[in-house]
Amino acid sequence: MIKIFVDSGSSIKQEEKELYNVEILPLKILLNNKEYSDGVDLSMDVFYKALIEDWQFPKTSLPSMEDTLERVSKCVEEGFDVLIITISSAISGTHNALKMLFKDNDKVRVVDSQSAVGGIKILVKEANKYLNETLDFVEEKLNALASRIIALAVPETLDYLRKGGRLGVTSWAVGTILKIKPVIALKNSVKVAGKVIGLKSAMKYLINALENCDVNYPIVPSYTFNLDNLTELISKTPKEYVGIMIEKDNLDPAIACHWGPNAFGYVFVQKKV
């Protein structure tokens, strides 16, 4: 029997653990010189006040290796095989750290989601179909699916991407002056998928991207802080796609800090080539 762990880069909330049948390893967040455990002792209100009103940019770091080792070892002692699905190794050191931590334990398998947030949720739903299979079998299934998952998001402002070091000064200045909306893609690494002028064009880009969506898997609608942009996007999206959407995902602080408030987007599985 397999027990599934994810890190909080999955944006699976503590109250959703039973829904997804997972255990959560919280990333660490340093905010105003205080360390928090993502999704555990940092409320959304405190986080967004710091981000919006105080213009404090949080720093994120790996889950506690000591706590992770203790929790995973306990599951192994109870007779479980353990599958850990991590945020993409291209944007966090979590995957490599956990691979090293459990490199000599054949009862533990660490899988790179190649994504984050909704992408991990999709992988968790898939993994839950195979809890009585071997770790080798499940890993192969997830790796194949992970390579097809893409997250597309539109930040309301470029300021947070700039402050987080993910956007150069020149690109930030030009984009801000021209009101350019970059559509950011997370598919293993973070890239600019497209550049459009204005919010309506950004929404049209996201909707058109769904033409390459594999409708056998869920779409995860995602946002930060304010639902308005996402609600408008969904209202413009064809019903065939709305019908396979799961619950709206208000991104956890560890991810939301890079996008800023009022970002929105879709996470989905692309069709096989």
Q: Across the structure, where does each feature detected by a protein language model lie?
A:
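A generic structural signal for short
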Residues: 1-2, 36, 60, 86, ...
